[in-house]
Amino acid sequence: QPQKCQREFQQEQHLRACQQWIRQQLAGSPFQSGPQEGPWLREQCCNELYQEDQVCVCPTLKQAAKSVRVQGQHGPFQSTRIYQIAKNLPNVCNMKQIGTCPFIAIPFFP
């Protein structure tokens, strides 16, 4: 299972659009990179998730969140936000059968 999801994560280029979407949400200003970016990014991110095997959606989102956190040198508060944004993405993408990912939004796990 983990290997398979790891592979999907790599195939989907580490959910690049989802990582950008998370960053954008974190910054709290969707207009930073132009207003047309927000909805477009969300759509791209959702498409990345739709490509994946359902069982991999949450594990790969967790990886994406981790990448964002590691790249950004975020403090504990922001780290928590990153995971909260990531775990809610299946809802944002209307993936009702997945809903909110079960991983916990805490900053300190590896």
From Swiss-Prot:
Residue positions, PTM Pyrrolidone carboxylic acid: 32
Gene Ontology terms for molecular function: nutrient reservoir activity
Keyword Disulfide bond (UniProt): yes
Keywords: Disulfide bond, Pyrrolidone carboxylic acid, Seed storage protein, Storage protein
Cysteine disulfide partners in this protein: 5-56, 18-45, 46-93, 58-101
Top-level division of the source organism's lineage: Eukaryota
Pfam families: Tryp_alpha_amyl
CDD domains per record: AAI_SS
Oligomeric form and interacting partners: The mature protein consists of a small and a large chain linked by disulfide bonds.
Note: Napin 1A and 1B are minor component of the seed 2S albumin.
Annotated function: The small, basic, water-soluble napins are one of the two major kinds of storage proteins synthesized in the seed during its maturation.
Family label: Belongs to the 2S seed storage albumins family.
Name of the protein this chain belongs to: Napin-1A
